[in-house]
Amino acid sequence: SIGTGYDLSSTTFSPDGRVFQVEYAAKAVDNSGTALGLRVKDGVVLAVEKLLVSKMLVPNTNRRIHTVDRHCGLAMSGLVADGRQLVSRGRAEATSYREFYGTDISGKVLNERLSNFVQLYSLYGSVRPFGTSVILGCVDKNGPQLYMIEPSGISWGYFGVAIGKGARAAKTEIEKLKLSEMTAREAIKEAAKIIYSVHDDAKDKAFELELSWVCEETGNLHKFVPKDLLEEAEKYAKQALEEEEDMSEEED
């Protein structure tokens, strides 16, 4: 069906019930740096492999992880500008909820409102779908919450999730973890290890690891991981990779 005209508009279904423009938007995510979220017993950890296109970039700029509300973080994969639009919308929703109800927005409600907003952009010929998937991590009165929203507007709740070019390999690694027994501090190291292990050195040379957490240790506020902890996690990740490489060489 591709190339027969059914892929010209996001308002057109193909004969087999597919909307190609939405599928193409998902391809933008599949070609982007990996992002993942881990929901553990005391909070949520978000990690992103931010691919660096130039050595001239200032460190810690063009972030892929943002704070949507004081207790909620958002990690994105795909087109960064589209992701920023969702961050702005998320912040507006969180602010209006607090003004109206006098309390913080729950992860479930924020996820519903954002996914409805994303889905609207697949209904009209005058707009295009968002070329980004986002992972929402919150801690509210119901405990840690983790959601992922796709360009189609579909969203699910997760214990662990990955998006981007290394998503499949990352999911395999996430499934090996005992997330319900893990603390956020431990999860930071594992998240760093997974991002380093799925990074493709052959295709993408340089990348910057972004890590954030919202947990009991941060007072249930979304914050970027402190520099010393980030460096410790990166060291752990590199050591673990070297050990795995040594073991595979010995087996050969």
UniProtKB/Swiss-Prot annotation:
Keywords: Cytoplasm, Nucleus, Proteasome. Pfam families: Proteasome (PF00227), Proteasome_A_N (PF10584). InterPro entries: Ntn_hydrolases_N, Proteasome_alpha, Proteasome_alpha-type, Proteasome_asu_N, Proteasome_sua/b. GO terms for biological process: proteasomal protein catabolic process; ubiquitin-dependent protein catabolic process. PROSITE patterns: PROTEASOME_ALPHA_1, PROTEASOME_ALPHA_2. Signal peptide: none annotated. The keyword Disulfide bond does not apply. One of its GO terms (cellular component) is nucleus. Its main location: cytoplasm. The keyword RNA-binding does not apply. The 26S proteasome consists of a 20S proteasome core and two 19S regulatory subunits. The 20S proteasome core is composed of 28 subunits that are arranged in four stacked rings, resulting in a barrel-shaped structure. The two end rings are each formed by seven alpha subunits, and the two central rings are each formed by seven beta subunits. The catalytic chamber with the active sites is on the inside of the barrel. Belongs to the peptidase T1A family. The proteasome is a multicatalytic proteinase complex which is characterized by its ability to cleave peptides with Arg, Phe, Tyr, Leu, and Glu adjacent to the leaving group at neutral or slightly basic pH. The proteasome has an ATP-dependent proteolytic activity. This is Proteasome subunit alpha type-3. It comes from Acanthamoeba castellanii.
